[in-house]
Amino acid sequence: MTIEHHLTKILKDRAAGAFLFIGSGFSRRYIGLESWEGLLSRFCEMGKPYEFYRGSADGNTPVAAKLLANDFHNHWWGSPTYSESVKLNKDKIKDSSSALRIEICNYLAKLDPSAALNDGYREEVELLSSLNVDGIITTNWDLFLEELFPDY
């Protein structure tokens, strides 16, 4: 019996539906989103590469993100690139990581989830969106899952 047949049998024999556990590989595969370190690298605009922050943090990614966020905070307030975002979001600033979080959210909101349909994944995406699941558990920030499963 193949794994597909085995899983199908298990799911058919259960009264409750399945939960999907979705990780970052999902967004990387279907919409080309960077890894966490790749996403942080995208916002290294202050003259220091991501490797500088990673090295300063002794390889600890959350600490590297905090160091980057501190530098980005200062950059965000003074950069013409972000002047419109500053006007729109300055009331949301709660700490030195807020500016980076805002701009990551802005970047993710601009991603086109329909790209997954154009990149050879149409059949997979359509199959996934037709699943009847009881819930989805994820830490992903992008909106691709919301598009696939609008009722959750």
Regions found by a protein language model. Name each.
Residues M1-Y152:
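Conserved catalytic-core helix/loop/strand module for nucleotide-ribose chemistry
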